[in-house]
Amino acid sequence: MDIRASIEDTRKGFEESFASEEFYNRQTQDAEHLERILAFINVRDGMRILDLGCGSGYLSFPIAEKNLGCEVIGLDIVSDTIGVNRSKAQEAGLSNLSFVSYDGIDFPFEVGTFDLVVTRYALHHFPDIKHSIGEVSRVLKAGGTLFISDPCPNDCDTERFVDDYMRLKKDGHIKFYTKTEWQDICSECGLQLTDSFESKIRFPKKKDTAYGYKEVLKNHDKAVIESYDLVETDTELHITERVNNILFIKDEA
């Protein structure tokens, strides 16, 4: 895999997504899920928090607004959106919130910078996931925590229909990971699972970006496809995906 080419595909794909703000919000926003995350991550005064793959700041802004005694930094590869986020944070008077762009590979922070790293609906786009989780571990303090929220394949989907489906839009999708896969990857980087919950997302996709949709359906078992409650309208496709929400803690030094 050409890692830099994959990152560029993701950057371009999300530039397009962020430009279609209303549809992007339909894909990603879920008030109930957000409130559950905010209660689950246990933010405390004085924390330094990194929102990895922050996008338009869906986690960054409410975390900063609810926890003025914390420093929150959003990190993303889409520099234009980072600029928009900075302006919004300034307009909102959130002096504890800042945004940083990076190359999608190495985090621009020192060892042990953060108490908490959060990431939502982003890691399935990271082409070298072991390196990225290693970077998370590097910038976390000993005893710090990582919160991952990302969709996962259904148990019956051993051939990964869902990944083929998500790759229909050329935005750098790599794969959805199972909870066990996350445990294995994170454990190798000194991060141990401490708590989790599962949620769901009803994900819309524009048909005019779903290149090869019919071919993907032909290549997978009908029962597996039906397990995702896939529905087709005149202009859109809708799929229900399970979401892993997992909390890890970094080993003490």
Locations of regions flagged by a protein language model:
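Conserved class I S-adenosyl-L-methionine
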Residues: 1-43, 58-62, 81-84, 147-169, 207-210
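Class I SAM-dependent methyltransferase SAM/SAH-binding core
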Residues: 50-52, 56-106
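A short acidic, Gly/Pro-enriched loop at the edge of an enzyme's catalytic core
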Residues: 105-116
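A short SAM/SAH-binding and catalytic strip from SAM-dependent methyltransferases
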Residues: 116-127
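A short glycine-rich, Lys/Arg-flanked "PGG" loop and its adjoining helix->strand segment in the class I
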Residues: 130-142
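Short alpha-helix
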Residues: 175-189
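Conserved Class I S-adenosyl-L-methionine
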Residues: 194-253
